[in-house]
Regions:
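Mobile, glycine-rich extracellular loop/lid and propeptide segments
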Residues: 57, 107-120, 132
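Hydrophobic/aromatic-rich effector regions of fungal transcription factors
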Residues: 101, 118-123
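Residue-level micro-sites within transmembrane alpha helices that shape
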Residues: 4-5, 111
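Bacterial Sec-dependent signal peptides at the C-terminal "C-region" and cleavage site
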Residues: 1-4, 15-24
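Low-complexity, Ser/Thr/Pro/Gly-enriched N-terminal "stalk/linker" regions
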Residues: 20-103, 126, 130-131
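Sec-dependent signal peptide hydrophobic core
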Residues: 7-12
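Generic marker of "main functional regions" within proteins
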Residues: 13-18, 40, 120
Length: 132
């Protein structure tokens, strides 16, 4: 709950800064942070390799919220790319050594699936696309 309050407080500050209409060093820092985050994403798998599969959903959610707050549409292709590529991601191997993949963001852990569901809800709200 404290994390939720912290996020909402941060979001209010960001919205206030953006609505002031004058250049803000905070907005510049947001942009720099987003660009750095995007540079860590693996273009082959669609996920942020240093974060792993389910935490990539959290990074994607942050990316989507960044776009919603700033109006930066440059990240919209990233959302689509993650949707196409991360939906079939190797999450491990079974006891026989056979690779295990998630399919359509479903794996053996409900919480992992929940993080992806939250990301796709945010993507749908931002883009208006029902596929997410």
């Amino acid at each position: 709950m404290d994390m939720c309050r912290h996020f909402l407080a941060t979001l209010v500050v960001v919205l206030f800064m953006v609505s002031c209409g004058r250049p803000s060093p905070f907005r510049d820092k947001l942009y720099e942070t987003m660009q750095t985050s995007l540079s860590w994403r693996n273009d082959t798998t669609g996920i942020w390799e240093t974060a792993g599969w389910w935490n990539s959903a959290n990074v994607l959610t942050a990316t989507i919220r960044y776009a919603a707050v700033t109006g930066d549409t440059d990240v919209l292709p990233v959302i689509q790319d993650v949707y196409e590529k991360a939906r079939r991601y190797r999450v491990g191997v079974d006891s026989t050594g056979t690779p295990r993949y998630c399919t359509n963001f479903i794996n053996d852990y409900y919480d992992d699936e929940g993080w992806w569901a939250l990301a796709w809800i945010e993507a749908s709200k931002l883009t208006g696309e029902k596929k997410y």
